[in-house]
């Protein structure tokens, strides 16, 4: 039987962020000025850390990522690049003497580059026709996998060469677009020789195949791995196209022999996502695996190959794993996963399957690398603090190594974050995060916001977001409460799975329970409570708008689903709606699906809408089409309800450009303040 043994106890249930001087106001401009720390890489000798810092430029409406190097103790941090474009995918090689990275060449095409560890002697070493999206050096550093795109299918100009200026698309099958781009090109892994100064003899591992690897939209180099002998590689692929691709999550791990081109399916017969291979120095292969085809939010298990046998190491672990890496001695697999409203670091003893927590507190951890045998490097953030680099040893408190965001964050007010347990209608206790404004006075009354999470199965952990930033909401005078309602990971598979086929069921009861619970707090102004959310959170807002019974004074929905029938017929990931809604709207004998379209469809309750609503969308959102938002806005205005729509022609499911982000935040608080601070 597995168990969790916390080696580090959180010192208190509430964390306070306090500025040393008079508090500054946390404005959208300040939020969008913060440097964004990511991708800490430990040098081979364990003495240095390489990391990136992306800095937005509000005036130019873009951002630029530069590379930094510091000692393993956080001292002597030096910026080693200062360029017009972003350096990405930076890794050490030649024992830490050099760094390889991706950067555009003089033609603007992203390529692989190398430089000395101090940033000098930059040289472009690849000559790909199209942008490279990432690369992985082999263990002997004599080969490299490069990810670039290849043409997908036949273009209109292929069919009609004389119509060179037509922009019409001829579409015969699914999935013709995905998330925020049309499927005109797909990624392939190319393997080639590398002598330290030039990449040659590149070969497309999937030459002639219309399969993608890594998998869109989230997949990167974590879906590629080398075997220790540098003679074989592993890639992740869902070898399906068209409709079969659109309804399936059945990916596999494939081992590819470079010399012969022979390919072996390592996960044959495993039906869900098989992903993110982690190979130990001796060649042990572990990976993340989901059980069910079509269920993208299934429990992510850790599997390991034992000869030809596939072993589930997490059969007794009831939580979904996000990230894995081997310890240097191969006795442990370290992993990060949602757990009770946070994202701690755990390790599993491979021999006896026992699990222990090695880094926790009210934080989320992001990535993990070893510096020697027992020192680990990671990034950490929370609702109150942006990402920074930390080091820790098992049994010791993490040590902060970078302070990129401190000059701004140290000027802000004393926002508090508390964990509150709220009873639900079915007798459970629901973990809810509550953020209190600066200079909080329990004797005063505050407007409040119910934060509705998206996903629908994404954790309400201690995330730091540059879009849905809960701290800036609290800094603007709101008590923010974020429930881990039914359907969120981190509380066992039963809690996570309950939402499937039941969008309007217990998860909505959980939201209403949280609202009612918070209204009983003496510091909550019960007449000025709002509900906000994006994606499934935006859907939740639409559903609550027709079923809240006067609980809320205003709503805000970003990229939410308004019409479930239309969503089924216009979205791209058909596996998603098949699993979550139960099936197609024309499948009249499918009671689960019929219940979804009958009881869970927000448009069925528009006649009950009576509350002001702000809706936001991006025209490049192919996950939840902007037409959903337009329907909701039109319905609200036709019913005489105060409403506003903010539409971004160039944005997708998220708002990413700095000036668009600032506009989003300004309209967000303008709307909330108008209706909740009267």
Identify the role of each PLM range.
Residues 474-475, 482-678:
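Active-site-proximal cap/loop segments of hydrolase catalytic domains
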Residues 35-49, 84-102, 122, 129-144, ...:
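Conserved beta-propeller blade repeats
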Residues 29-65:
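Beta-strand-rich domains and repeat architectures in extracellular enzymes and scaffolds
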Residues 59-65, 105-110, 181-185, 244-251, ...:
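Short, solvent-exposed loop/turn segments at conserved positions within beta-propeller repeat blades
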Residues 241, 293, 404-527, 534-535, ...:
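Cap/lid segment of the alpha/beta-hydrolase catalytic domain
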Residues 64-65, 146-208, 236-239, 243-252, ...:
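Predominantly five- to eight-bladed beta-propeller fold
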């Amino acid at each position: 039987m597995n168990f969790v043994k916390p080696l580090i106890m959180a010192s208190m249930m509430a964390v306070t962020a306090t500025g040393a001087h008079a508090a500054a106001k946390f404005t959208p401009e300040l939020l969008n000025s913060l440097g964004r720390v990511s991708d800490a890489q430990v040098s081979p000798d364990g003495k240095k850390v390489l990391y990136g810092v992306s800095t937005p430029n509000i005036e130019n409406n873009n951002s630029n990522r530069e590379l930094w190097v510091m000692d393993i103790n956080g001292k002597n941090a030096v910026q080693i690049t200062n360029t017009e474009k972003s350096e990405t995918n930076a890794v050490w090689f030649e024992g830490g003497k050099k760094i390889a990275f991706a950067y555009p060449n003089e033609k603007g095409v992203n390529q692989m580059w190398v430089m000395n560890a101090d940033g000098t002697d930059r040289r472009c070493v690849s000559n790909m026709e199209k942008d490279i999206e990432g690369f992985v050096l082999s263990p002997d550093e004599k080969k490299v996998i490069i990810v670039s795109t290849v043409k997908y299918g036949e273009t209109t100009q292929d069919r009609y060469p004389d119509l060179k200026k037509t922009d019409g698309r001829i579409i015969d099958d699914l999935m013709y677009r995905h998330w925020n781009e049309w499927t005109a090109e797909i990624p392939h892994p190319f393997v080639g020789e590398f002598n330290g100064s030039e990449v040659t003899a590149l070969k497309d591992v999937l030459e002639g195949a219309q399969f993608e690897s890594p998998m869109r939209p989230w997949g990167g180099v974590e879906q590629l791995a080398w075997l220790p002998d540098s003679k074989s590689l592993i890639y992740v692929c869902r070898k399906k196209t068209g409709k079969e691709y659109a309804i399936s999550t059945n990916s596999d791990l494939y081992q590819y022999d470079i010399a012969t081109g022979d390919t072996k399916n390592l996960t044959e017969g495993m039906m869900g996502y098989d992903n993110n291979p982690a190979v130990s120095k001796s060649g042990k292969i572990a990976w993340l695996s989901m059980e069910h085809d079509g269920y993208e939010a299934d429990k992510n298990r850790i599997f390991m190959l034992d000869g030809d046998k596939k072993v589930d190491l997490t059969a007794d672990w009831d939580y979904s794993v996000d990230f894995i890496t081997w310890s240097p001695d191969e006795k442990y697999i370290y992993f990060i996963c949602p757990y009770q409203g946070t994202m701690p670091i755990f390790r599993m003893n491979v021999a006896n399957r026992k699990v222990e927590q090695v880094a926790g507190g009210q934080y989320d951890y992001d990535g993990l690398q070893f510096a020697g045998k027992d020192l680990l490097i990671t990034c950490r953030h929370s609702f109150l603090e942006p990402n920074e680099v930390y080091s820790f040893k098992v049994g010791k408190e993490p040590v902060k190594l970078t302070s990129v965001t401190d000059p701004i964050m140290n000027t802000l007010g004393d926002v508090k974050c508390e964990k509150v347990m709220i009873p639900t209608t079915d007798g459970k206790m629901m973990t809810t995060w509550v953020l209190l404004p600066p200079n909080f006075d329990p004797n005063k009354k505050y407007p409040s916001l119910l934060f509705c999470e998206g996903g629908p199965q994404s954790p309400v952990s201690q995330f730091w977001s540059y879009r849905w930033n809960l701290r800036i909401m609290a800094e603007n005078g709101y008590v923010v409460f974020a429930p881990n309602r039914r359907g969120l990971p981190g509380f066992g598979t039963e809690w996570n799975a309950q939402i499937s086929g039941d969008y309007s069921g217990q998860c909505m009861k959980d939201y209403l329970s949280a609202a009612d619970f918070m209204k009983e707090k003496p510091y909550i102004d019960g007449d000025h409570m709002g509900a906000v959310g994006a994606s499934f959170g935006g859907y939740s807002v639409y559903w609550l708008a027709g079923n809240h019974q006067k609980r809320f004074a205003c709503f805000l929905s970003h990229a939410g689903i308004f019409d479930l029938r239309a969503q089924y017929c216009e979205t791209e990931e058909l596996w998603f709606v098949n699993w979550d809604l139960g099936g197609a709207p024309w499948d009249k004998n499918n009671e689960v699906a019929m219940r979804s379209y009958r009881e869970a469809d927000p448009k069925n309750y528009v006649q009950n809408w009576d509350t002001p609503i702000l809706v936001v969308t991006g025209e490049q959102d192919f996950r939840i089409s902007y037409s959903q938002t337009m329907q909701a806005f039109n319905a609200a205005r036709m019913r005489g309800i105060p409403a506003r729509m903010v539409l971004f022609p160039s944005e997708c499911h998220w708002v990413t450009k700095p000036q668009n982000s600032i506009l989003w935040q300004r309209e967000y608080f303008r709307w909330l303040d108008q209706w909740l601070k009267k």
